[in-house]
Amino acid sequence: MKKIGKRIRNQALKRIYEIPFLQKHADIAYRSAVHNHAINLPSLSATDLTLVETVKQEGVAIASLEALGIPSALKMFDIAKLLMPEIPGIVSGDKNEYVVHATPGQMVENPEIFLWGLEKRILNIAEHYFGLPVAYQGAFYRRDIANMVEHKSRLWHIDTEDRQVFKVIIYLTDVSEDGGPFQYIPRPITEQVVRKLKYKCGYIQDKNMLEALSPSNYRSCRGVSGTVVFAATGSIFHRGKKPVTSDRFAVFFDYTSRLPKYPFFSQYSLPYANLLSFSEQLDRYQLQSLLWQEYVIE
């Protein structure tokens, strides 16, 4: 009952925030914050600047852990691979089940995975994408089951929980076209489809998407184990294509800015006490991204 009450309250607040006058005022404040923060953006290498520009224009950029060369990546990746046998294939028996996540306990027991999302280089890339300080929304370790279910994140959608959403996806297994690749529609084409379908939010069946554009516009992010996908999921239609040959294992690292569009939806991905235990290993910049609710931009 408590969860239902909170959901009803949040939906009511969302409708208030979307009153045109209030929304316009919030949008002006947001643009002003981006403008004012421009001089405070961290420096990036030419390679990372190109990556950010690719994400802004296309919606996605693809790299690899090896090419990124972040020192902690090897240990994180090895630990993530070792966790794979601990993630069950089926847990509920629900015929619509298509994904199993690592439990909060498993994430706490393997902190290297969660903490990798707070690597300064990754935070700096995300900050340049947003133009604002970063809120780290957490790491989500998932096993996508090889079956024919097309539900929720396997349907076309745009992440609308904030103005912009940024994700870093690491494949733990080789992902072929039949292995459940992350799929997207390039940003310029997404914008056309949004207008054509009058899209606001929610999920779109593939048969309905095919009425709006040719499947030749679909892009599949195939890659070997260790492939890294940077995605602006708040600006592009995307989905996880259903895997049919084998289960897909991947870790998703999620980010928004510290100026949320709907602050009442905000919640940490792990218990606060666990986040505090992680904080001992972080500098101030990383800590502010981790405990971002305490450092929201006013």
Task: Give the label of every model feature segment.
Residues 10-154:
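Non-heme Fe(II)-dependent double-stranded beta-helix
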Residues 161-177, 222-223, 230, 254-257:
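Short, conserved beta-strand element in jelly-roll/cupin
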